Amino acid sequence: MGGLMKKNTLILGIESSCDETAASVVKNGNEIISSVVASQIESHKRFGGVVPEIASRHHVEQITLVIEEALKQANVTMDDLDGVAVTEGPGLVGALLIGVNAAKTLAFMHNLPLVGVHHIAGHIYANRFETEFKFPLLSLVVSGGHTELVLMKADNEFEIIGETRDDAAGEAYDKVARTLGLAYPGGVQIDKLAKDGEDTFHFPRAMMDEGSFDFSFSGLKSSFINTLHNLRQRGEEPNPNDMAASFQASVVDVLVSKTIRAAKQYDVKQLLLAGGVAANQGLRERLIQEVKLELPETELIIPPLALCGDNAAMIAAAGTVSFLQGKRSGFDMNANPGLLLEDI
């Protein structure tokens, strides 16, 4: 990428696909100058999940403040920027619209190029702040709405070689946490409890031995809920640490074994972890351990915790790659909640 750069490229990234309103200024696609995230977790906690209408209202309230703060922290004005990148999809349509409209307005007013970004491409490119990419590479993307194995042979070329057939891993975490009476977001709570528990319940590992790289978590979720229900029917209250550890062991086993198998089959130079569930300590530790054992020649890249959840620095990073490839979005760009990674 270095050869393409005549000068420093400064991109403003905007992210509003779910329950974080974020803006960031990034230099050359790999250096964060500022990153501001306004989280809505407290507002959604009492509902046990994200309420789209509440999310949209928060985005409306926060978007201008967040963008202004990102510019202020970076000590730049709109005139210093080379372009504006924004999450175009997938996500909640009402939430996406707020970011897209803000980006279109700013780009139009300041005569700047506009670049639409796929949210998952953003999660993958969050790893660009750690190191340059070496192709071919494989990304394990694990979040509330996505569980995918994505093969890349070049920048901005995505091939999904495995995906969930039902629930995403993060979704299963949240549902299981709710049945245990844990606060939202559930994944973090399960991870904490699992540290002090043992895999005593031996929940099923779905599609573990199949040739495909697809995932399935609905059977595990049902097994967990049924086990908990049956124990409570008998008047027993199971150890929540062991329940959490058993659930997490099942998820991590499947994710890691399929990822290692795919990395071997496609002979990748780098293996990336991406998405909100990339913050999960159990998953991080197990992946590090297995890569050392099974793929000593493969470089494992794990983003810092601050870049696992939704943020705008990752959108600016992915947007910079598209910008330098000459890709532009028109002012007719709209929020696209069903945007496919392979179509970008």
From Swiss-Prot:
Any one GO MF annotation of this record: iron ion binding
Binding site for Fe cation: H119, H123, D310
UniProt-listed Enzyme Commission number(s): 2.3.1.234
GO terms for cellular component: cytoplasm
Cofactor note: Binds 1 Fe(2+) ion per subunit.
Entry-linked CDD domains: ASKHA_NBD_TsaD_bac
Keyword set includes Acyltransferase: yes
Names of required cofactors: Fe(2+)
Family: Belongs to the KAE1 / TsaD family.
GO BP annotations listed: tRNA threonylcarbamoyladenosine modification
Name of this chain's protein: tRNA N6-adenosine threonylcarbamoyltransferase
Biological role: Required for the formation of a threonylcarbamoyl group on adenosine at position 37 (t(6)A37) in tRNAs that read codons beginning with adenine. Is involved in the transfer of the threonylcarbamoyl moiety of threonylcarbamoyl-AMP (TC-AMP) to the N6 group of A37, together with TsaE and TsaB. TsaD likely plays a direct catalytic role in this reaction.
Pfam families: TsaD
Record bears the keyword Acyltransferase: yes
Compartments, record wording: Cytoplasm
Keywords: Acyltransferase, Cytoplasm, Iron, Metal-binding, Transferase, tRNA processing
Residue pairs linked by disulfide bridges in the UniProt entry: none
Reactions it catalyzes: L-threonylcarbamoyladenylate + adenosine(37) in tRNA = N(6)-L-threonylcarbamoyladenosine(37) in tRNA + AMP + H(+)
Binding site for substrate: V141, V142, S143, G144, G145, D174, G187, D191, N280
